[in-house]
Amino acid sequence: MGRSLKKGPYIDPSVEKKILAMNEKGEKKVFKTWARDCTIFPEMVGHTIAVHNGKTHVPVYITEEMVGHKLGEFAPTRTFRGHGGDERSSRVR
């Protein structure tokens, strides 16, 4: 279930402040954030943000298609190691 429209999107104040300051200066620096719940807003397009995945910071390049999504959606927290194990070799032939 999404967030209520009357509340508006959640934008982390520190992320917003850094992005707006970089846009004024014309910089494109990578900065770290732990705010996985921050909604991506249009001013972020073209920036790279290092989003924490619980272990490390994953660099996420923001494109126009990402606007409206959350930062955490692009920094996976779990590593997929494949389905099952050595099933075929353990079966009796």
Swiss-Prot record:
GO terms for molecular function: rRNA binding; structural constituent of ribosome. Gene3D superfamilies: 30s Ribosomal Protein S19, Chain A (3.30.860.10). It comes from Symbiobacterium thermophilum (strain DSM 24528 / JCM 14929 / IAM 14863 / T). HAMAP family: Ribosomal_uS19. It holds the Pfam family Ribosomal_S19. Keywords: Ribonucleoprotein, Ribosomal protein, RNA-binding, rRNA-binding. It comes from the Bacteria. InterPro entries: Ribosomal_uS19 (IPR002222), Ribosomal_uS19_bac-type (IPR005732), Ribosomal_uS19_CS (IPR020934), Ribosomal_uS19_SF (IPR023575). PROSITE patterns: RIBOSOMAL_S19. This is Small ribosomal subunit protein uS19. Protein S19 forms a complex with S13 that binds strongly to the 16S ribosomal RNA. The keyword Ribonucleoprotein applies.
